[in-house]
């Protein structure tokens, strides 16, 4: 009986260690991606000639970003960890290039404030998603359709040009991606609890980092827009 309880305790501890390792690897990839994006954006903005060239190539760069996200998402199980990592790094760098325009459009104070609030919001919701007992998996379809609805509203506003609609979209966007942060974190935790390991775990941590990275980036962009709307 005692031996059986010890074995159970050892198994539980091993599982907890696997979860910690997996989540730490995921957050490390995400943090590295954000750092790379920030660094590339800053360095690009410091070079006026490069910044102007990037601005002229904005559409091709955005299409390249979409292509990388598509490949990482759709072929996650076929890519090696090395290739997935390289694609993630490439995506973060491309995002940095396109984000360099933000440093011209917004004041340093606005960017720093939005980043700080984004970090706080992301951190709280990620912790909530990790520790909450309620199963959030059923929310997946809701989040999918909510994001699609948000994209449609943003496309409509490109033609309408309503500042009120833009503010409303941004406020909904912050809440939506805050919720997605909790959802994605719980899905990653559950994946780690399933006993995933080796190359498969490495690939999953990179794709998980991409999901969390996108959650953070969207929260940041919507908060920037909210701050700009109130100025």
From Swiss-Prot:
GO terms under cellular component: plasma membrane
GO biological process assignments: regulation of proteolysis
InterPro entries according to UniProt: Bax_inhibitor_1-related (IPR006214)
Main location: membrane
CDD domains in the record: BI-1-like_bacterial
Name of the protein: Uncharacterized protein DR_0893
Keywords noted in UniProt: Cell membrane, Membrane, Transmembrane, Transmembrane helix
Membrane topology: Multi-pass membrane protein
Keyword Cell membrane assigned: yes
Location relative to the cell: Cell membrane
Family from the record: Belongs to the BI1 family.
Record-level Gene Ontology MF annotations: calcium channel activity
Highest rank taxon of the organism: Bacteria
Segments passing through the bilayer: 26-46, 56-76, 84-104, 112-132, 142-162, 163-183, 206-226
Organism encoding this protein: Deinococcus radiodurans (strain ATCC 13939 / DSM 20539 / JCM 16871 / CCUG 27074 / LMG 4051 / NBRC 15346 / NCIMB 9279 / VKM B-1422 / R1)
A Pfam family matched in the record: Bax1-I
């Amino acid at each position: 009986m005692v031996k059986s309880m010890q074995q159970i305790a050892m198994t539980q501890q091993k599982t907890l260690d696997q979860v910690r390792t997996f989540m730490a690897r995921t957050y490390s990839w995400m943090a590295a991606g954000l750092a790379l994006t920030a660094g590339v954006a800053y360095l690009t903005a410091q070079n006026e000639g490069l910044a102007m060239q990037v601005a002229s190539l904005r559409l091709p760069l955005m299409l390249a970003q979409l292509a990388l996200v598509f490949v990482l998402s759709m072929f996650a199980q076929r890519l090696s960890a090395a290739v997935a990592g390289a694609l993630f790094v490439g995506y973060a760098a491309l995002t940095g290039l396109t984000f360099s325009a933000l440093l011209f459009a917004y004041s340093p104070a606005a960017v720093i404030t939005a980043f700080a609030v984004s970090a706080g919001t992301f951190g709280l919701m990620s912790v909530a998603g990790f520790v909450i007992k309620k199963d959030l998996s059923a929310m997946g379809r809701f989040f999918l359709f909510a994001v699609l609805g948000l994209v449609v509203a943003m496309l409509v506003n490109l033609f309408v040009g309503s500042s009120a609609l833009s503010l409303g979209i941004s406020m909904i966007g912050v809440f939506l991606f805050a919720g997605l942060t909790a959802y994605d974190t719980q899905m990653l935790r559950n994946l780690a609890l399933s006993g995933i390991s080796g190359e498969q775990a490495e690939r999953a941590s990179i794709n998980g980092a991409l999901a969390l990275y996108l959650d953070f980036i969207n929260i940041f962009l919507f908060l920037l827009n909210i701050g700009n709307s109130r100025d």
